[in-house]
Amino acid sequence: MFVLTGYEYFLGFLFICSLVPVLALTASKLLRPRDGGPERQTTYESGMEPIGGAWIQFNIRYYMFALVFVVFDVETVFLYPWAVAFNQLGLLAFVEALIFIAILVVALVYAWRKGALEWS
């Protein structure tokens, strides 16, 4: 009799997880409509003819704000599980979270002083 251990279950799960996206992409490739010609390749802007080119350069300040946002968004992702389990973790986890927040505050002050958050 064949007995499955934990590794066989994991490999089966990995195989299925790899197979599902491949099958989905293959099915969409086979079932999609064929090329509709040059009209289908044009840009659609609410039924109007597009004005100007589609390739414009954004100001670098947008990227700086986006980078600062991502840093603090990741902070939220790390602090949420800590806040949920706050009662069970104890004082050491509280000190670690304070150190983590302090590092991010120092980074925010640094970005502020360097002018990364100024729009002028």
From Swiss-Prot:
Q: Which reaction does it catalyse?
A: a plastoquinone + NADH + (n+1) H(+)(in) = a plastoquinol + NAD(+) + n H(+)(out); a plastoquinone + NADPH + (n+1) H(+)(in) = a plastoquinol + NADP(+) + n H(+)(out)
Q: What is its EC number?
A: 7.1.1.-
Q: How does it assemble?
A: NDH-1 can be composed of about 15 different subunits; different subcomplexes with different compositions have been identified which probably have different functions.
Which positions, given as ranges, span the membrane?
A: 2-22, 64-84, 89-109
Q: What is this protein called?
A: NAD(P)H-quinone oxidoreductase subunit 3
| Membrane topology designation | Multi-pass membrane protein
Q: Where in the cell is it found?
A: Cellular thylakoid membrane
Q: Which gene encodes it?
A: ndhC
Chief location bin:
membrane
Please give the Gene Ontology molecular function terms for this protein: NADH dehydrogenase (ubiquinone) activity; quinone binding
Q: Name one GO biological process term.
A: photosynthesis, light reaction
Record keywords, A-Z: Membrane, NAD, NADP, Plastoquinone, Quinone, Thylakoid, Translocase, Transmembrane, Transmembrane helix, Transport
Annotated Pfam families:
Oxidored_q4
Per the record, the similarity remark reads: Belongs to the complex I subunit 3 family.
Biological role: NDH-1 shuttles electrons from an unknown electron donor, via FMN and iron-sulfur (Fe-S) centers, to quinones in the respiratory and/or the photosynthetic chain. The immediate electron acceptor for the enzyme in this species is believed to be plastoquinone. Couples the redox reaction to proton translocation, and thus conserves the redox energy in a proton gradient. Cyanobacterial NDH-1 also plays a role in inorganic carbon-concentration.
- Organism source for this protein? Synechocystis sp. (strain ATCC 27184 / PCC 6803 / Kazusa)
* GO-annotated cellular components: NADH dehydrogenase complex; plasma membrane-derived thylakoid membrane
Give the top-level enzyme category.
translocase
Domain of life assignment: Bacteria
